[in-house]
Amino acid sequence: MGNLFYFILAAFCEISGCYLFWLHFRSDKPALLLLPAAACLLVFAYLLTKIDTATAGRAYAVYGGIYIVCSLAWMYGIEKFSPDIWDYIGVGICLIGASVILFAPR
């Protein structure tokens, strides 16, 4: 499977895990949510080890751009809140930076 698949899956595992923590600590949902939250975060960390790159730092830097896109998709799809123009501009800037890191000749 390709890097993009792992990046997107990792992002949704991280966002899911963090969102479950958010629900417990900010919305008074049951503490039982912390178990699947921890599992999601473990899977997230594992998935980033599957990225085909020589350095962890470069994988994490590129992942950052993908994470931001997935976060806005989460906000729209799960939280039912539409991104605004500044969200789109910000994600564009981040994707440009991630692309420079990913596609730079080395």
UniProtKB/Swiss-Prot annotation:
This is UPF0060 membrane protein CHU_3331. HAMAP family: UPF0060. SUPFAM superfamilies: Multidrug resistance efflux transporter EmrE. It is a multi-pass membrane protein. The chain crosses the membrane at residues 5-25, 31-51, 59-79, 85-105. It is found in: Cell inner membrane. PANTHER family: UPF0060 MEMBRANE PROTEIN YNFA. Keywords: Cell inner membrane, Cell membrane, Membrane, Transmembrane, Transmembrane helix. InterPro entries: UPF0060. Belongs to the UPF0060 family. It comes from the Bacteria. It comes from Cytophaga hutchinsonii (strain ATCC 33406 / DSM 1761 / CIP 103989 / NBRC 15051 / NCIMB 9469 / D465). One of its GO terms (cellular component) is plasma membrane.
